[in-house]
Amino acid sequence: MKKIAIVAKVHDPRCQGVAEELIQWLEERGLTPLVESHLARHLRCGEGLERADIPNLADLVVVLGGDGTLISVARLVGDRQVPILGVNLGSLGFLTEITLDELYPALESCLSGDYRLSERMMLRVELVRDGQAIKSHQVLNDMVINKGALARIIDLETAVNGNHLTTFKADGLIISTPTGSTGYSLAANGPIVHPDLDCLVITPICPHTLTNRPIVVSSDALITIRLQSQN
């Protein structure tokens, strides 16, 4: 590993300070720090590197912040096989497991090849209208359908692999990966799922029917959700 990208929560002064120290640490070891453009402007260290270019150039991405910052980076590099080292400087640290005290020892291990990759599954989501896919996204944590601010309960007809599962009458529906099970799904009374498991969690948001509970399905399942009505 020679080129190390640095992405941080730019408006957090603590993250900026750690980033400056990290840049110096890398340069002292003859490594090339690739500073994300927004962070570079805050640190006044040149133009930096656009996020879209990080997957093509970096051997490792160091993320300084919380889970939200790491998830935004995962969307970029998830299908490029670029490892991410998450350092917890935020309020949530389910994904950013490395503490600040562990940052440099962890980096030394990565540079020497003494590390273990934790692979996480991602979820591909398509929005279909009139039989045409109009949007497609790949996400690390979850996909959420919710009602508008002034709307009432919505009916969500749900099928798995073409077989009718149920119609959720609720404020919305969450489809989460094991990684996303500790986020919005957990707040909606969904289960915590170990990240090594190959499954997806279907969690209704404030269901109107008590029997509408979270359901766990296989990771290779095709989940189809049709909005029946919106009042």
Predicted features and spans:
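ATP/NTP phosphate-donor binding region
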Residues: 1-60, 101-116, 127-137
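Redox-cofactor binding/interface segments in oxidoreductases and associated redox assembly factors
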Residues: 6, 63, 175
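Short glycine-rich anion-binding loops that position phosphate/pyrophosphate groups of nucleotides
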Residues: 11, 67-69, 92, 179-181
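Short glycine/serine/threonine-rich phosphate/pyrophosphate-binding segments
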Residues: 15, 68-74, 182-187
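Gly/Ser-rich helix-loop-strand patches that form or flank binding pockets
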Residues: 72, 77-87, 94
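Catalytic core of DAGKc-family lipid kinases
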Residues: 92-171
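ATP/nucleoside-binding phosphotransfer catalytic cores, i.e., glycine-rich phosphate-binding loops
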Residues: 145, 161-164, 210-231
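Gly/Ser/Thr-rich active-site loops/lids in small-molecule metabolic enzymes
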Residues: 166-211
